[in-house]
């Protein structure tokens, strides 16, 4: 049995994945890193080889999983099974989900609704069903699901997106309460106004003038960094915070308050 803690991070080559993996590796975690197998989400990354080498230099054993579809039960079970087969345990799981479609509600299509639901809501359902059983059996574990602060603050032009995110937030909170008695924590972090390629491309924030307008909408008057988001997430994942569960945390610079 592996004595180091083991953490799983999905869609790990982009978004919060690299800085979070570094923090967990440095704090004594081995890692299972899932990489996207298509362009169905807004979280895209790059060649993971340098990151894997960097994590190994920090003392982490790393298992990379690629060819799975996390919109399915089978895909989520596969990444959990890899963790158990390689390391014999799963202590922490961070599930990154996200696809966005904007537009007027009456101009929306059923196909758009089904796409958003499959990534933003169904993926969360499948992830929780796969990760919970081994943690319950071990009597310990931490799960964090990334959603969106938009699920807590409805806005026009993103009704489908906001609805699927709100559903994911509610699911995570209820599942966290239901499984607290087993020593497993389940929490959601909903982000907005984060400085990463997906957000900048969607909002035009790569343009300095447009970015200034966007930042003026945030109470903190700036975009959040992936490094500070990773620090916040690590506290919920690394075993230090075992009395916090069933919560939705908005990480948006005060925007959703």
What role is predicted for each listed range?
Residues 43-47, 181, 193-218:
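A glycine/serine/threonine-rich, flexible loop-to-helix segment
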Residues 180, 185, 244-246:
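Short, small/polar-rich loop/turn modules that mediate ligand/substrate recognition or access, typified
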Residues 104-105, 112-117, 210, 214:
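Substrate-binding pocket helix/loop in short-chain dehydrogenase/reductase
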Residues 2-36:
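Canonical Rossmann dinucleotide-binding motif of NAD(H)/NADP(H)-dependent dehydrogenases/reductases
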Residues 108, 154-162, 174, 202:
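Active-site loop-to-helix junction immediately N-terminal to the catalytic Tyr of the SDR YXXXK motif
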Residues 222-251, 256:
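C-terminal substrate-recognition "lid" of short-chain dehydrogenase/reductases
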Residues 128, 164:
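Active-site helix of classical SDR
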């Amino acid at each position: 049995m592996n004595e180091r803690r083991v953490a799983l991070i999905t869609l790990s080559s982009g978004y919060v994945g690299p800085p979070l993996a570094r923090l967990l590796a440095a704090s004594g975690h081995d890692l299972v890193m899932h990489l996207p197998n298509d362009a169905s989400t807004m979280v895209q990354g790059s060649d993971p080889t340098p990151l894997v080498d960097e994590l190994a230099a920090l003392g982490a054993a790393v298992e990379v999983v690629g060819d799975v579809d996390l919109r399915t039960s089978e895909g989520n079970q596969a990444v959990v099974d890899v963790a158990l087969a390689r390391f014999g345990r799963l202590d922490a799981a961070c599930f990154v989900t996200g696809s966005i479609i904007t537009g007027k509600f009456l101009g929306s299509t059923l196909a758009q609704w089904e796409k958003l639901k499959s990534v933003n809501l169904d993926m969360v359902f499948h992830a929780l069903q796969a990760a919970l059983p081994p943690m319950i059996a071990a009597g310990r574990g931490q799960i964090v699901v990334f959603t969106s602060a938009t699920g807590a603050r409805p806005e026009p032009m993103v009704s489908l997106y906001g609805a699927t995110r709100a559903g994911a937030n509610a699911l995570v909170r209820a599942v966290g309460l239901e499984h607290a008695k087993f020593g497993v924590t389940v929490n959601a972090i909903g982000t907005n106004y984060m400085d990463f390629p997906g957000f900048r491309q969607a909002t035009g924030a790569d343009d300095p003038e447009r970015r200034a307008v966007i930042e003026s909408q945030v109470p903190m008057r700036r975009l959040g960094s992936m490094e500070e988001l990773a620090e916040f997430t690590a506290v919920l994942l690394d075993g230090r915070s075992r009395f916090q569960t069933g919560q939705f945390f908005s990480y948006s610079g005060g925007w959703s308050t």
